[in-house]
Amino acid sequence: MSSGYSSAPSVSHTSSDTDLNRIDSYDDGAEETTDEQRMCGLSELVTSCLTSSRLKAIDEEDEEENCNDIEIVGLSKTTTKVKRSKKVLSCPIVSSSTKKENGNAAPFLKSSQFTDVPPTIRFYTKGTKVTKPARKIQARLTWCHNSLLPIVMRQTLAASHFTVVDESLFYVGYWGRHLKSAQYRALQPHQKVNHFPGAFHIGRKDRLWMHIRKQQERFEGEFDIMPFTYILPTDRQELLKYLETDASRHVIVKPPASARGTGISVTRKPKDFPTTATLVAQHYIERPLTINRAKFDLRLYAYVPTFEPLRVYIYDQGLVRFASVPYSHSVSTISNKYMHLTNYSINKLAEADGVANKPVPKWTLHHLWEHFDEMGVDREKIQREIEEVIIKAFISTEKPIREHMSRFLEQEFICYELFGIDIILDEDYKPWLLEVNISPSLHSGTPLDVSVKAPLAKDVLNLAGVYVPPSFDKLSDADYSTRPRNGRKNREQLIKEASWVAAYKDQLGVIDNRIFKRLTPEDTRALVEFEDELERIGDFKLVFPTAHTSHYQKYFAETIYMNILLQQWQIAQEDDRSIGINRLEQLCRQKHMQSDQETSF
């Protein structure tokens, strides 16, 4: 074979969602295996025999209103345990739905593009009729109950036949509070959780600023993405000196780990800067952009499936949050929280407090872009600059997060995270990062919220790539070798990584397609995961890495092999993705991901 990357042979695919739909009509006892194999070459993970175990359900009304269509199992004073049967049955992936039902129902599974890579579960918004999987698979479609699990997420899970269960029971997924670091060690390969250990490095306002400040010192003038911030009480004297030089200066004081407007104030009074409590004080942007004379900020949503290699997606939709009363530069108004703060949790009370004669407005992000178009504003430039701010924020914090993960997480693929990014525009349309939230609220109190957050919940779960879990008796020895990124690196991989990182440094950040001459099993897993992920992207947009983001590599605290591999892959794939995809498919057909041997091309 030729050693050139561009000469990879073309391989046709027989796997498709149509194949999956066709399997949906098989009976529980069907012996047909050809279509299952053709579907996507399912691994032992989902083709293994299934036990006849069932979760014992109890009738319990959900603690949140409007969720009575979602069953919660095991929430009684006496914990309900999973009963296991010694009898093993042979059954297919999906249930014996009738052909008529399948014709009207959306598919339950999303096939991989690649042989021997299992499919992922499809998620939908409320009201979508979805093909039911086999009963014994549906028994394992369980999600951990948590008080932070929002209604739109519950409804999305219910549409795909998931049951919400007590945390003491077997569960596949978790969406809730950030876990304690040590809890990540107990997670199993079949589980998915919505946080990374160490995410506080970007979610805490003090940590985020510390990391951005380091980047400002390394790259002067290139990381002015966040208003200057003081960490109190350490920086108290520096803050007082800043305020003394100009009587019009103010700062926004916030607790470092709060959300939804808790504990926020705009001030310049020394008494508001305690000498003991930990707070952050951020330069106040005195000339913000206003719409209809009101100050506003943006809530955007960023999704990160992995920090090695770092990948960042931004959701196409978002929220625009307004202050309740017209903005004024007057110092005398500085204490008016309804004028200077844009948190919806604060401003929704303005009408009841008598300071506004109507409910505070809220726009979608699309509404804002339409407004800019009508005003003749270059909104594409603003969007590019916002993307740059978000990318730089994640690059600033990725090293400490990776280091924290390495201590507490054996398999990175079990984690994913949705971040709430708060951005404000000044009067020159420059975007400024205010903070990053690691648990952005998906609770939806208005139809506008539902229109944004319900599709978001669905797209997040699809992008996360939730697999059908193995049977209860197979959990300890399930074969995850065909899953992307199994967390292990052999000597061959380590040697290749070290040599290419050294070459990258020697060539001053230049890399070429020779990095693809030999793809190791670990390389293949990472690229297969990425290509399948792009097939589930929904309304997210990949902003890093792309074919045009190689200039960001210099900002990383250290050169990571997987980052440069994926960056170069994006450059090589720009004109024709099918070439690389066909090569990966050939490797999958050769069971390369299960091999410890390197394949030469």
UniProtKB/Swiss-Prot annotation:
Residues involved in L-glutamate binding: R321, Y344, S345, K362, K453
Reaction catalysis annotation: L-glutamyl-[protein] + L-glutamate + ATP = gamma-L-glutamyl-L-glutamyl-[protein] + ADP + phosphate + H(+)
Residues binding Mg(2+) 2: E435, N437
Enzyme class of the recorded protein, top EC level: ligase
GO MF terms, alphabetically ordered: ATP binding; metal ion binding; protein-glutamic acid ligase activity; protein-glutamic acid ligase activity, initiating; tubulin binding; tubulin-glutamic acid ligase activity
Observed phenotype of the null mutant: RNAi-mediated knockdown at the L1 or L4 larval stages causes a defect in egg-laying.
GO biological processes: microtubule cytoskeleton organization; protein polyglutamylation; response to hermaphrodite contact
Biased composition range(s): Polar residues: 1-18
Domain of life of the native organism: Eukaryota
Cofactor(s) for this UniProt protein: Mg(2+)
PROSITE patterns, per the entry: TTL (PS51221)
Annotated binding of ATP, by residue: K254, R260, G261, Q282, H283, Y284, I285, K295, F296, D297, T342, N343
Biological function: Monoglutamylase which modifies tubulin, adding a single glutamate on the gamma-carboxyl group of specific glutamate residues of target proteins. Involved in the side-chain initiation step of the polyglutamylation reaction but not in the elongation step. Preferentially modifies beta-tail tubulin over the alpha-tubulin. Involved in side-chain glutamylation of tubulin in sensory cilia. Together with ttll-5 and ttll-11, required for male mating.
Protein name: Tubulin polyglutamylase ttll-4
Biological source species: Caenorhabditis elegans
Taxonomic lineage of the native organism: Eukaryota, Metazoa, Ecdysozoa, Nematoda, Chromadorea
